[in-house]
Amino acid sequence: MNKQDFYFDLPSELIAQYPLANRSDSRLLIYNRQTEEYGHYQFREIADFLQPGDLLVMNDSKVIPARLYGHKATGGKVELLVERITGDFTFLAHIKASKSLKSNDLIYLDAGKRLEVLQRQDDLFLCKASENILDLLNDLGHIPLPPYIDREDESLDKERYQTVYAKCAGSVAAPTAGLHFDEAVLSSIRARGVNIAYITLHVGAGTFRPVRCERIQDHKMHSEWFTVSPDLCTAVKAAKSMGNRVIAVGTTALRSLESAAMGGELIPCSRDTDIFIYPGYQFKVCDGLITNFHLPESTLVMLVSAFIGHQECMALYQEAIDKRYRFFSYGDASLLL
């Protein structure tokens, strides 16, 4: 298939620039793959469409304030986006500067803090901080809003560009399907008899990388670290053995589950994945997916197309556009069953 097969015309005013006042105020477009029927609801109603015994798998990765601003010894401005923390003091980052940095260069930050460039690794730079990197980011870092949110980060983003169940620090972009869940929705889901389990996948900046190849099969996915625990494997197998559904909350949860089942059976693991899911992929674990509405020609639209069918995906997205759904990270959600 070609990249253009996944194009749709999205009015710019449908790209959500801010979250709604309440997380569960988001709209919810529900699609049933068997009946090909869909309906329009509010996200707070989602428990009504889940069944006792269903297993929701959520990504508990926590967004770090990964964007830093500093300057070189010459005074030239430097902007960093931390891609991956590799140790207490070391990390890989994207760096923007007027002139490319080299090994041993220093980057000066506020409050007398500084970073040292150790070496270049392809498009990234391995750097070392003058103190624990997580502490430094929490002091000076900015929330790394996606490129399609056309504004600077604000104080509200520290809370709202984060799921209420985020626990494991490491993502530079939010697992956005989880942003709609508040404590009331989680309580209603549990009261319904639905089980919840967690995976961790640290979302990298590569999630926003466009597909540049004409043939989508030629696209090389970015790599992200994930972990699937023995407890999660047990929960998935228990659900499957009872004939219950495993529903991924977000494409990151789905990609983690499918990556851990590449051999046909879900196994515990902690490693990198660059799995690329597009039409023709045979799903091994996931029976349902909760996800936002994604960019035209993106790998995430290709994943949704693989899950519900290409024509069905394009028709569903056109329905969302016609009904003025809000798109992307701070936008509305879909439940695909």
Swiss-Prot record:
Keywords: Cytoplasm, Queuosine biosynthesis, S-adenosyl-L-methionine, Transferase. Transfers and isomerizes the ribose moiety from AdoMet to the 7-aminomethyl group of 7-deazaguanine (preQ1-tRNA) to give epoxyqueuosine (oQ-tRNA). It is found in: Cytoplasm. Monomer. Gene3D superfamilies: QueA-like (3.40.1780.10). This is S-adenosylmethionine:tRNA ribosyltransferase-isomerase. Its EC number is 2.4.99.17. PANTHER family: S-ADENOSYLMETHIONINE:TRNA RIBOSYLTRANSFERASE-ISOMERASE. It comes from Legionella pneumophila (strain Lens). GO terms for molecular function: S-adenosylmethionine:tRNA ribosyltransferase-isomerase activity. Its main location: cytoplasm.
